[in-house]
Design a protein with these regions (language model features):
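A generic structural micro-environment signature
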Residues: 7, 27-31, 54-57, 65
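Acidic, low-complexity, intrinsically disordered interaction modules
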Residues: 31-56
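Short, compact, well-ordered microdomains
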Residues: 48-72
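N-terminal acidic leader/helix
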Residues: 1-28
Length: 72
């Protein structure tokens, strides 16, 4: 990720945090800063974003899980 992309991600995650939406990184509660760092140093894979909703479709959490890239 370039510097601009990291800044955009940070701003987005801070908005969710301010809204009280829990953030998770690989299944554990996390912070915008930790998620940002994981994105920057990820090698041999990417982070998949998963929006967690309640029964009414309202956002109740945001999860980032590492997914390994398969070799061709």
């Amino acid at each position: 990720m370039n510097k601009r992309e990291v800044n955009v991600l940070h701003q987005e995650l801070e908005i969710y945090r301010e809204m009280g939406i829990p953030l998770y990184l690989n299944g554990k509660k996390s912070t915008p800063k930790r998620i940002e760092k994981a994105y920057r140093i990820a090698e041999e894979g990417v982070y998949m974003r998963d929006y967690i909703q309640d029964d009414t479709g309202r956002l109740k959490g945001l999860s980032f899980d590492f997914v390994r890239e398969e070799e061709p």
